[in-house]
Amino acid sequence: MVVKVLFFGVLAEISGTSFKHYQDVRSIGDLKLRIQDDFPEIVHYVFRISLNSEITDNDLVLKEGDVVALMPPFAGG
C-alpha cells in the first residue's frame, strides 16, 4: 500500500521536497513515526495533519492512494 505525503512551508524545507511516497504504513500514527525517522528535526515543529483534505488524528487507518498533508500553523485575514 502506498500513500502520498505532502509537505508545506517549513516542513517542505526540512524534508527537502514537497511530497514523498510511503509504503506499508497502517495508520496516521505509524506514518508520523516513519516521517520522524526520515526527518528527525521535524519533531521540533507544530503541524496539523489532513487525510484526503480533512483534518484528522493519529488513529485513522490509511488506505491505498490516500493523500496526507502536513501543514504548519498558518494565519489568515
Predicted regions span which residues?
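Ubiquitin-like/PB1-type beta-grasp interaction modules and other compact soluble beta-rich domains
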Residues: 1-76
